[in-house]
Amino acid sequence: MRGRLTHPAQRRLRRKSDFEAAYARGRRFGNGFFAVTAIPNDIGGPRLGLAVSVKNAGSSVERNRIRRTIRESFRLHQHELPHVDLVVSARGRARDAAGSELRASLLALWQKVTEQWPAPSHS
């Protein structure tokens, strides 16, 4: 059975040290819209951190749209992901992309992460 499709606080990266650890020792994946840095964790599930800058995403409306899209994709696919900390950074092309393009791009990145570290099976 799939777990609940929520995004509780324990599934979020918040501390600067968590972001720094991911950037220093994590594996990078990317495409035209996003860069993902992933590092295994001992938390028992994936955690998400966002880095959506004014430089790459423009106005607050666009930044928040991109953030919502990332969080929603993570929420829907978190039970298929391995136990890793993920830092997702938006690239400049994400600003003008349609929501469907962003969702497809994120799905491809989640699959790359899962190929690197297979998700534990939920029997």
Model region roles, listed by residue range:
Residues M1-S123:
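Positively charged, solvent-exposed patches that mediate nucleic-acid binding
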